[in-house]
Amino acid sequence: MKNILISLGGNCSTNNDLIKEQFSDIIGVDNGAQHLFNRSITPNVVLGDLDSIDPSLLKQIKTMEIDIKSYDSNKDKTDFELAIDSINKPNDKKIYLIGGEEGEVDHLFSIFSIISNYEFAENLTWFYQDKTIIFKRNISIEMKKGSRFSIIPITNLKHLKITGAEWELNEEDLNSGSSKTLRNISNSDVLKISCESGLFCLIY
């Protein structure tokens, strides 16, 4: 499965060690391209309405072998959606996101909303500040004992089970947006989360 990196606009403070060679395609979304250049990573695609990218950076990009896809600002999709649409067969890719931090609150909520509607949501990983955000239905993940994590039900969850945590659940139904599974603590080296149906977001 190939890896795709998408760098969103807004702030980007992740300290995740990104290596260009890990990714088959690298997409800079508007001023998200700046985050890539700051990390000495050259995108092969820069797209969006390009209204927030630094003019000097855009000028530099135009001299490079980078595919530029410019869209009118009056469009029906966000730049993030356009980035996803540009990926060939996203169901077969692992998609990693950086950026998108501390921008306008509607942009933040739209990213979560957009991801939850994709059938390949489980393929996405978002490195947000010092956290990792993933979207899953079932997961068994190694986690240092004492680590904090939160589970956010993106949809209604049926028979949610959590083991390896301070506050465990045994096949409990939770409604979308429930706060019951926020701010938990791992008490084992392996955290297991599963549900019969539904999609949740794990932040750790």
Where are these regions (language model features)?
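Short phosphate-binding loop-to-helix
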Residues: 68-90
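Long, charged alpha-helical interface segments
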Residues: 136-204
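Short glycine/serine/threonine-rich phosphate/pyrophosphate-binding segments
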Residues: 14-15, 77-80, 104-109
